[in-house]
């Protein structure tokens, strides 16, 4: 699998995750605008640092890959909000 195919797979996984979370949360990310998304990105970066530094996750159902997919989606959400303004 080449890099383009790998990126397509990541986009596909991220889109499916976005759809599931969007069903649960709706358009909640837009409520607080880009600053709200920045806070969530900061939370995920902290989680990324914690996982990579400690090599363990205390939240068993959230792996490093999940955190990175969330970061991918939060970046996309920020882009959506920027395009709306």
Please give the residue ranges for each predicted region:
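Intrinsically disordered, low-complexity regulatory regions
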Residues: 1-85
């Amino acid at each position: 699998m080449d890099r383009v195919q790998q990126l397509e797979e990541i986009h596909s996984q991220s889109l499916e995750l976005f759809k599931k979370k969007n069903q649960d949360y709706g358009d909640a990310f837009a409520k607080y605008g880009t600053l709200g998304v920045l806070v969530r990105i900061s939370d995920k970066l902290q989680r990324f640092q914690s996982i990579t530094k400690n090599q363990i996750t205390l939240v068993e159902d959230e792996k490093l890959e999940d955190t990175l997919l969330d970061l991918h989606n939060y970046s996309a959400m920020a882009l959506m909000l920027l395009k709306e303004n």
